[in-house]
Amino acid sequence: MFMIFMKYLQPSERLGVFLAAVQSMRAPSPHSTELAAHMVDVLAAETDFHSGQVLHIVWAIYRSLPSVRAALALQSLDRALLLLASKRPRETVASLLQCSLTCTSVAVTMWRAMVSEPPATERVLHELLRILMNQSGCKTSTSTKHHLRIQALAAARPLHEILLLPTSRGEAKAIFPQLFLALLFQVSFTTELKLQEVQVFWEKHQQDLLTPVRSTVQALKALLRSVGLGSQVLAIEAQGVWAALLSAESHLWGVQVVAREMKELPRSLRTTIIHQLVELLRTEASSWQTVAMVILSKLLECTELGDELDCVVSLFASYLRSPCLGMQSLVLRAILGLTERPATARQTLVLLLSITEQLQAADSDTRAVALPMLSTMLRLLEGRTLSLAALELASKLPALFGDDSSTVRLLSICLFLDTLGFVEGSQEKLQQVAHRSLLPLSFHLHDQDESVAEASREALLGVARFLRWRQLAHLAETLRAGRSASACWPGGAAQQRSTWPRACPTCRACRSPCSGRL
């Protein structure tokens, strides 16, 4: 009878009948409940509700469900939600998130109904993943309807509930790399929330004690367990990392540890995650860049790397110029790890020029990472390529001799001396570089750091020999020998230094570079 009646209903009228049927399920009458359940079943199966109608339906079910007692009616509503999730996953998921940002017990019941069969589970998980990944760059708004950042906060709660279901494991495993990254990014996002956004999230839900970042961490743990990584969850717990992820000050360290534990994943999964990270880092700038690079650098510590390394190296070339605070140092540390392994070191050589170019603008910490790496890279080169690279690097290094960091001063002076022996041909250019290094080196002959002072004297001697400058070489040897004997000098090192200007014509030698050549 109802099927005949339904043929004459307009699409807009069908929505009204559906809503009335849902509301009538609250009545205790078995007859009315049975009829209402039949109407809901038929309308859900035969009608393609548009997005605005889906929102009304989901709200109606959410409001009515606590008052529905009949098993027949509850089963009918479950089937309706399953059909809506299958036909209109985007609208259904968004509507239920609007109904309950903090995923109340009623919402949990509805989410479970929506993922009760694998095809719908896959669609719902993909939609939640899309929402998690769409939060970056959205402006703050007090409207949850159009605010993707707020929806992203809400998405972690139902995701946690869904991942606890045994029936979701197959679908979760299929998109594990994407879900894993989305949740780690969400951890970073939730530790940087604006006060207004937190207030919007908690409006009318202040009794719920599970904060947004805790929801995300719970979902991440559930995801790892659902794909058989329970031992990794325990290992992370033992290091106090789950707690660290909750804090803005320590969450990046927590991300590092979680990523490091993922090195035990099968190679196919690791490769997929690396490719996913590279793709994300190639897109427009986002708040995820630092977190993504932290994860990538840890995964690159794996002993087995294939074609994905070429993609990563090309990505590093652009990120060495990133203005993002700390990004240069992060990239350089990842490259340094690759240069220290014979299987991957040579693939990093294409970055040598880019690293050299960044030395001048880099901070001391970044330089301290870059200089040992450049030394390693030079030793992997041969012939003319080595000579040209060494000459270019030698021209940049004297500017680093005066760095505030004694480590950088020491590394740059030692590396400069090494480059003199790597250059073949181009003697005129190298001589110009060597002459320009004399004054910066002389400033550090008595550096407050004894290691730097000793390196400066060795470098000065090396430059003098390279230039075949006899008087300067003699002076450098005297300085080196005198320093070694300073402990035995009457009156100590200070007394010894006070005699050098009268014994050694340093200034005259430096002012007359053409005299006394070997």
Language model segments and positions:
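Hydrophobic residues within the alpha-helices of tandem HEAT/HEAT-like
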Residues: 2-6, 21, 25, 36-47, ...
